């Protein structure tokens, strides 16, 4: 791709300074940076919560939290909601999406800059509401799924669950507004000559994700609003004594909840495609197949939601359909895995930190995918449902998969964002500590699940003690790795070497590498022309 660009030095024009620059910012780069900082902060908080309940689970007896099992449930709930809505989505979709989509398509900014500002700032009150809910009336001990009747006014009297519901309303609104912005930007603001099928795969992944958010989030909003009125205004959507059905809530929640796991992982797929192509010095293998796989994953993700509900009493035909549909998702996912491997095959591969995290992602995601095939079988799921086998499965895919893509993207683009290049040896140490830590945490949970240990239980028989101790040690290592990552960020900002325009060489051929590091405040005011 021959790229001609006009590097304008208007950095200082119309740039507000101090706190106003960040509070009132309509610049996509500033907002992307704020999303990433917010995500790192929320991720540390959510990680500390998980460390607390892993310490509780390290030994049987329930002594660490002093037998306060409501607190245990609140920690479980807060950990999940923070990691999904306040860590991984703001990092991948909000942070990298906002910062790099305009750069990758040659746009001067996002289509609706002020909408972009409110999309970010809605997250802050949402996070405060969620944190505050933990200190009100014992906190929301419902799990992130908020199932009634546990989340009903009889199961949780007081304002805690209502605050959590309003928190989800705000974060959902933030996501929907951000999605509208990104869709309009991608369709209307591409540089001349950049057709849809010339866009980098990261842009495609954000586009598909944005459509998923717009289709899925309102369903969650409707479900939790119905729960809110059940709790406060006497409706009986989910109360059996008034003709309602709590299983209806599960259908509504998981109709959002299953697309949500693809909302979390799809931007990561895009990042991995960019990174593997760059460090294999080859174009991505099967570009159109990769695009098609993402679109198919997005579509099929909407029609398999009840595989989360195999034990609620679905009809035999429904079990067959949802089992088959879930297994079919393995096909487009397999296309992506094999295309990444084919891209590396025969390439001039180097292994800097972003590439290590991408390869680590492929390994972890494949393990999680294999256990997903096992869980998709409704007969086997009767045994494994709500055990630690499920916890291991979704952490290997949604959590470790998405987390490793976030780290890959961060190390890949950190020099471009900050103008400082991280020390390679520190990044590689971070990768290996994280890789060992997360596998030590979650791999033993497969064995616990197969042995029958249920999820969300603060105490357990001594037979499960060994693997739980291993898992808790792994959680400590993983948390240490996360804090080490924060150290690397600050160390790089203070002592890092200046990053060249393109630190990665010939393989990095997308538009952002034609700009300075960091890019000027206003970029592509004259659109670049994309030629074959």
From Swiss-Prot:
Cell compartment(s), UniProt: Cell membrane
A single GO cellular-component term on record: respiratory chain complex IV
Catalytic activity, reaction form: 4 Fe(II)-[cytochrome c] + O2 + 8 H(+)(in) = 4 Fe(III)-[cytochrome c] + 2 H2O + 4 H(+)(out)
Bilayer-crossing regions: 33-53, 74-94, 95-115, 118-138, 163-183, 200-220, 252-272, 284-304, 318-338, 355-375, 394-414, 431-451, 473-493
Pfam families: COX1 (PF00115)
UniProt binding sites for heme a3: 393
Record PROSITE patterns: COX1 (PS50855), COX1_CUB (PS00077)
Known pathway: Energy metabolism; oxidative phosphorylation
EC numbers for this chain: 7.1.1.9
Residues binding Cu cation: 258, 262, 307-308
Membrane-related topology note: Multi-pass membrane protein
Main location per the UniProt record: membrane
InterPro entries from the UniProt entry: Cyt_c_oxase-like_su1_dom, Cyt_c_oxase-like_su1_sf, Cyt_C_Oxase_1, Cyt_c_Oxase_su1_BS, Cyt_c_oxase_su1_dom, Cyt_c_oxidase_su1_bac
Biological process annotations from GO: electron transport coupled proton transport; oxidative phosphorylation; respiratory electron transport chain
GO molecular function, one term: metal ion binding
The keyword Transferase appears for this protein: no
Family indicated by similarity: Belongs to the heme-copper respiratory oxidase family.
Role noted for this protein: Cytochrome c oxidase is the component of the respiratory chain that catalyzes the reduction of oxygen to water. Subunits 1-3 form the functional core of the enzyme complex. CO I is the catalytic subunit of the enzyme. Electrons originating in cytochrome c are transferred via the copper A center of subunit 2 and heme A of subunit 1 to the bimetallic center formed by heme A3 and copper B.
PANTHER family in UniProt: CYTOCHROME C OXIDASE SUBUNIT 1
Name of protein: Probable cytochrome c oxidase subunit 1
Organism: Rickettsia bellii (strain RML369-C)
